[in-house]
Amino acid sequence: MSSTSQKRKKIQKKFKNRGYNLKFDALDEILVFADQFPDDDDGEAIDLLLDNLQETHKSSTVDAESVRGLINRLLGAHNAPEEPTTSASSLAIIDAFLVPKFGYDSVKKKFNEHTSSLPIHGEASAKTALYRERFMLLSQRVSRAEHFSRPAFDAEMSQFENNEISSIQSLISQRGRKWVMGVISQLEDGHFYLEDLSASVEIDLSKAKITTGFFTENTIILAEGEMQVNGIFQVITCGFPPLEDRDKTLKAHSEYDFFGGGTLTKEEMIKLADLERQAVNDTFVILSDIWLDDEEVMRKLETVLDGFESVETVPSLFVFMGNFCSRPCNLSFGSYSSLREQFGKLGRMIGNHPRLKENSRFLFIPGPEDAGPSTVLPRCALPKYLTEELRNIIPNAIFSSNPCRVKFYNQEIVFFRQDLLYRMRRSCLVTPSSEETNDPFKHLVYTITHQSHLCPLPLMVQPIIWNYDHALRLYPTPHTIVLGDKSEQEVCKFGGTTCFNPGSFSTDSTFVAYRPSTQEVELSAL
């Protein structure tokens, strides 16, 4: 009998003795969890899992979703330092490849979790599903908006009360002004098209009044207009689907763990919210573009570490976002052994600050030009070959994906390192509106929050792993979004969400000190 079969039987027996019936997919999740503790011959990890399950799980049937949430919390505790400033239960770090995937069923009007494994190299149908699921996600959100054209659109922009959305296919048989919703594209220069699940239609944006945001290919828009005799839909006003209040989204979908980290009871959420308010001393220090091969940058970084080593309460978390090299780590890059040594040097630098080493956690997120299998999103964590020496010196170091999610008590924070602002501006199909703001960063924040997606660029501009597009969703809208970008540092608060760019540490010596308890952002520089 194989060792895997023996493990399966052993796990099933333990759960049966405690009165639990394990579903097949839950057993697979537990096997993966157990494999992370190869020296655990006595099954203590499984016993710990069962002890925690008895405290939170009321049903005798155990499914994959319940197990996954519990395992994420336990692994967060396992990876935490012994005496951190922030307890393991307060801070969970969720890799993009572990984010639960949900698809919307428009017939049953509910979300279904995808529990089977997701291949990195998906079939062609996965690409089609990517667009369909993005559209369905926003469509069900809009369906809850009593007046979806407000406040996303100015009240004076439309004189009509009927805001019902028509399918594009039905435009052929209808007259008068209609609202449609679809994915915008440009199949040929100067010719724009709008497509929903029923059909596509050419649209004329020459007379359209648009709202704030970057209108790029792949973005989903709401448009009011009228069908012309030439078969072109003349757009009068258009904008993004209106943003939904986070609390309203949670009320509609309280049973789903969209963010990752496990679902919580109402009592647990109240308790965590209270603890979060009390955690006034917790600080996250966020730096982007830390070029380890640049001596001047390393001297500046040591100055930052020296400063925080001497404060009364050291930061609970340091977030180091790439790029970690001044040159792109592409096929022509031949200095990987040198880069490995530089990560080791960074580990020794952190180790020279004993209070930070013992009490802070260090999260590393790769940048768009860092070493990795490809530039496709989401990006996996930095290769272990590069970080091995640093890991040995700093046990509190965590290497995660890009994007990466962090849960601080109840607060949901998304980190994304991508030079998104420049690429979104360059990919615009129409000139952004200047009526509400001329600030490009505000246009960017408006776009990604209304699209509920971190990177709504065309796939030809920024490839995405089709089966993991859900890892870039911003649904429900998180409390905080950190957009690591080489552009100037900036902060923007919009729709209940705090969004900021820490700037480029290597170029401008800028970074951010973030206090999650109050969502206060301190833009800093040397």
Swiss-Prot record:
Pfam families (UniProt xref): DNA_pol_E_B (PF04042)
Highest taxon above the source species: Eukaryota
GO biological process, one term: DNA-templated DNA replication
Native source species: Arabidopsis thaliana
The protein, known as: DNA polymerase epsilon subunit B
UniProt KW Cell cycle keyword: yes
Subunit structure: Subunit of the DNA polymerase II. Interacts with POL2A (via C-terminus).
Main location: nucleus
InterPro entries registered for this protein in UniProt: DNA_pol_a/d/e_bsu (IPR007185), POLE2 (IPR016266)
Family that this chain belongs to: Belongs to the DNA polymerase epsilon subunit B family.
Location(s) in or outside the cell: Nucleus
Induction info: Cell cycle regulated. Up-regulated at the G1/S phase transition and then decreases rapidly as cells progress into S-phase.
Keywords attached to this entry: Cell cycle, DNA replication, DNA-binding, Nucleus
Cellular component, GO, one term: epsilon DNA polymerase complex
Phenotype upon loss of function: Embryonic lethality when homozygous, due to embryo development arrested at one-cell stage.
GO MF terms held by the record: DNA binding; DNA polymerase binding
Annotated function: As accessory component of DNA polymerase II participates in chromosomal DNA replication. Required for the timing and determination of cell fate during plant embryogenesis and root pole development, by promoting cell cycle and cell type patterning. Necessary for proper shoot (SAM) and root apical meristem (RAM) functions. Is essential to promote the first divisions of the zygote.
Intrachain disulfide bonds: none
Record's keyword annotation contains Cell cycle: yes
